[in-house]
Amino acid sequence: MKLLIFVVEDDVDIARLVQHHLEIARYSVRVFANAARALVDAEKYKPALFLLDIMIPGGDGLQLCRNIRSSENLANRPIIFLTARSGEADRVLGLELGADDYITKPFSPRELVARVKAVLRRFDKPLTPMVHELGDLHIDCERVMVSVRGEPVVTTATEFRLLDYLARHPGRVFSRDELLDAVWRDTAFVTPRSVDVYIRRLREKIESDPENPQYLRTVRGMGYRFEAP
């Protein structure tokens, strides 16, 4: 069965180009020029991945990303921004909203397909088929689920991989570059600053006090370590 990808792009020529190359790569593709319609259909069909332009009718792509991340049915689906906005501030904002990759226009169709495949691989395969029980924190790698004190915590695919990787090496200090190599192997999207963004997002989700984290500790001048209780 082919994986379904939703492309939300109001430029007809770009949408056709993206659809053509993704279908050659054996994906099923649905194209939307309107954010509101895309979200309604996404709740029904639950696509494997979203490709979003930022500037689209019916609500911008950033708001659509927020809506996807707040949806019980869609929150774990990977999101790639495909946009003409190439500034660092736009990239960081995309990260903070939960995007898994960011491709700027103009782009190579071949690279686009490669990046889609890379993101789907990261989403589909947890690092280790096991369960971490760490105090109040529960990480189920088989089911790709996180809970704190029994309450489910919604994470993106990349957030899950980062948390899983750190939890499998408690006490070990990782530099930002080491985490980039281990968790984001296949993408040029992230920078050392991006790691900080993901750590902050995870702290907000799993820590009782994100300003004084119990699990995800900062080691000044070196990077981060996971502290097992």
Which residues does each predicted region cover?
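His-Asp phosphorelay/catalytic-motif detector in bacterial-type signaling
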Residues: 2, 46-48, 73-78, 189
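Conserved acidic carboxylate
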Residues: 9
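Charged docking surfaces used in two-component/phosphorelay signaling
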Residues: 13-24
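Short hydrophobic/Thr-rich beta-strand motif most characteristic of the beta2 strand and flanking loop
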Residues: 26-34, 41
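Active-site beta3 strand of CheY-like receiver
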Residues: 45-51, 56
